[in-house]
Amino acid sequence: MDNFLALTLSGTTPRVRQGKGAGFRWRWLSHGLLELTPDAPVDRALILSAGIHGNETAPVEMLDKLLSALYSGSLTLTWRVLVVLGNPQALAAGIRYCHSDMNRMFGGRWQSFAESDETRRARELELSLDTFFSSGQARVRWHLDLHTAIRGSHHLRFGVLPQRDRPWETDFLAWLGAAGLEALVFHQAPGGTFTHFSSEHFGALSCTLELGKALPFRQNDLTQFNVTSQALSALLSGVETSTSFSPPLRYRVVSQITRHSDKFALYMDAQTLNFTAFAKGTLLAEEGDKRVTVTHDVEYVLFPNPSVACGLRAGLMLERLP
């Protein structure tokens, strides 16, 4: 199964659906779903996902290189792994999504959207995670969902962590720093993301990794993510990652800007970078007689997008943590 990406993009079902790799067994489950199981017993399970948005190709290419290293035997596998290429049709078309944003649908929220390829895929991925986690007795469960951002950022690589009732484990946060993440953003409320679903329903330590900017296939400079690729390789093979890194800055979400109607106006232009700072009192958005302003001394914007569909998030406002 050294052509997993090509099969996924072409929508082709492989003639052989399971086999042996270098020290592991592989099993093709469905388009964009591949299970890897080490020959030796392990108590760690990992979801490695990318391509939830079809125009975010750099992480997909990174995963393809990791799979090639595993199949060649140059990388040892020490986790049970479910590799997920989230939205095959959008990936093949080179678009963010075909009908609706899948990363708003998880946790059963797909039932609130008009039926589409994305709603069916979200349901399939939920069932796939349930089967994967329930078929083993993993003591450690991680989910790393790899993305790229629509626009540029003051932090080239950053992580977004779902709301979680329990404290985050220090080794997980340390690994995120070793993977080159310059900032970590902590959600304070539930959401429909893939990582919130895996965290809430399966207790996984989950993070959305934002790696650079969305570009088409074969136009990505993967060298700018070498530190992340090296950390992923070390993780898969059970090797300790470097401790010589600067701890990521930490932010938490303090509010969400939501577009409710065509009267919505977001006062940020296309050049506004993620993590741009705004002073207290700054007018951020208006919709009819409703005004959205900065309420803390300083707030930072994340994912500003004035053109989202009505009812969806047009941006998050953050505050820095000590």
UniProtKB/Swiss-Prot annotation:
Keywords: Arginine metabolism, Hydrolase, Metal-binding, Zinc. One of its GO terms (biological process) is arginine catabolic process to glutamate. Disulfide bonds: none annotated. Its cofactor is Zn(2+). It catalyses: N-succinyl-L-glutamate + H2O = L-glutamate + succinate. Pathway: Amino-acid degradation; L-arginine degradation via AST pathway; L-glutamate and succinate from L-arginine: step 5/5. Transmembrane segments: none annotated. InterPro entries: AspA/AstE_fam (IPR050178), AstE_AspA_cat (IPR055438), Aste_AspA_hybrid_dom (IPR007036), SuccinylGlu_desuccinylase (IPR016681). The keyword Lipid biosynthesis does not apply. Binds 1 zinc ion per subunit. SUPFAM superfamilies: Zn-dependent exopeptidases. The active site is at E210. Zn(2+) binds at H53, E56, H147. One of its GO terms (molecular function) is succinylglutamate desuccinylase activity. The keyword Metal-binding applies. Its EC number is 3.5.1.96. Pfam families: AstE_AspA_cat, AstE_AspA_hybrid. Belongs to the AspA/AstE family. Succinylglutamate desuccinylase subfamily. Transforms N(2)-succinylglutamate into succinate and glutamate. This is Succinylglutamate desuccinylase. The gene is astE.
